[in-house]
């Protein structure tokens, strides 16, 4: 299961849906990185 943009997540545990979506350690949600 994966999470979409700005969905709450647990760093190092949850997987965000796209390769350039990562779980932010600061905000604890999936955000885009470029």
UniProtKB/Swiss-Prot annotation:
Disulfide bonds join 2-17, 9-23, 16-30. One of its GO terms (molecular function) is sodium channel regulator activity. SUPFAM superfamilies: omega toxin-like. Changing residue 3 to A: 5-fold decrease in activity on hNav1.7/SCN9A, no change on hNav1.5/SCN5A and loss of activity on hNav1.4/SCN4A. The keyword Disulfide bond applies. Keywords: Amidation, Calcium channel impairing toxin, Disulfide bond, Ion channel impairing toxin, Knottin, Neurotoxin, Secreted, Toxin, Voltage-gated calcium channel impairing toxin, Voltage-gated sodium channel impairing toxin. InterPro entries: Huwentoxin-1, Huwentoxin_CS1. Pfam families: Toxin_12. The record marks 5, 26, 28 as: Important for activity and sodium channel selectivity. Changing residue 15 to A: 3-fold decrease in activity on hNav1.7/SCN9A, no change on hNav1.5/SCN5A and 1.7-fold decrease in activity on hNav1.4/SCN4A. The record marks 6, 27, 29, 31-32, 34 as: Important for activity. Changing residue 6 to A: 5-fold decrease in activity on hNav1.7/SCN9A, no change on hNav1.5/SCN5A and 1.4-fold decrease in activity on hNav1.4/SCN4A. Changing residue 34 to A: 13-fold decrease in activity on hNav1.7/SCN9A, no change on hNav1.5/SCN5A and loss of activity on hNav1.4/SCN4A. GO terms for cellular component: extracellular region. The mutant [Phe5Ala]GpTx1 may be used as a tool for probing Nav1.7/SCN9A inhibition in vivo. The primary structure of the mature peptide is identical to that of Gtx1-15 from Grammostola rosea (AC P0DJA9) and Gtx1-15 from Paraphysa scrofa (AC P0DL73). The presence of a 'disulfide through disulfide knot' structurally defines this protein as a knottin. Belongs to the neurotoxin 10 (Hwtx-1) family. 08 (Gtx1-15) subfamily. Potent voltage-gated sodium channel blocker. Potently inhibits the voltage-gated sodium channels Nav1.7/SCN9A (IC(50)=0.58-10 nM). Also shows a moderate activity on Nav1.1/SCN1A (IC(50)=6 nM), Nav1.2/SCN2A (IC(50)=5-128 nM), Nav1.3/SCN3A (IC(50)=20.3-170 nM), and Nav1.6/SCN8A (IC(50)=17-20.1 nM). Shows an unclear inhibition of Nav1.4/SCN4A (IC(50)=200 nM to >10 uM), Nav1.5/SCN5A (IC(50)=140 nM to >10 uM) and Nav1.8/SCN10A (IC(50)=68-12200 nM). Weakly blocks the low voltage-gated calcium channels Cav3.1/CACNA1G (30% inhibition of the peak current at 9.8 nM). This is Toxin GTx1-15. It comes from Grammostola porteri.
């Amino acid at each position: 299961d994966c999470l979409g943009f700005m969905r709450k997540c647990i760093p190092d545990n949850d997987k965000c849906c796209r390769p350039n979506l990562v779980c932010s350690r600061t905000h604890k949600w999936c955000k885009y990185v470029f």
